[in-house]
Amino acid sequence: MQHKVRLTVIDKKVYPELQAAYCADPNAGPCPCYHVGDTFLFARYGAADDFWHGGLHTLCQTAQTADGTAGGDVPHCSEAWDAISRYIYAGLQGGSLMRGWMREENTMIACCSDGTRPVLFRIERLDYKAVYPAALGAPDAPDAPDAPAQ
């Protein structure tokens, strides 16, 4: 089995009263790096390795342009990456993202740590391809040598 991970921006929050009280720019507004509905796809097999490049060029869908959008022509925001990368890595390896906490163990909801304008993400492990080790003689593998007679 091989795995990909789909990341979707499901919500953005902004707390103007906190920005006014604490931020150098009291009118910072919502996060400019992500847009609700942005979708990213991560793969890590063969020559593909989206994880180690901070998710650069993983953006698949956006209501905006890829220019300046995280995962497009720029890597993911470091605050967001710190919150989501552990789940992306676990998913790419086929691991449970949050067994016993979420309804489905292949899904996690996480958010970045920006306290005045957090972005919320749905992270999903996608199980997509069975890998048959024909070279090892797996009897059910396509084009595998016949299993030894019993």
Which stretches of residues belong to each language-model region?
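Short, structured beta-strand/loop micro-motifs enriched in basic residues and often containing a Trp
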Residues: 3-4, 10-25
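Function-determining sites in protein domains
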Residues: 1-3, 35
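Short, flexible N-terminal segments of the mature chain
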Residues: 21-48
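Compositionally biased, intrinsically disordered low-complexity segments enriched
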Residues: 136-148
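Disulfide-bonded cysteines in secreted/extracellular proteins and peptides
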Residues: 23, 31-33, 60, 77, ...
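Short, Lys/Arg- and Gly-enriched loop/turn segments at beta-strand edges
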Residues: 47-79
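Short, compact, well-ordered microdomains
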Residues: 78, 82-138
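Short, structured patches in soluble enzyme cores that scaffold and shape functional sites
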Residues: 7-11, 44, 125
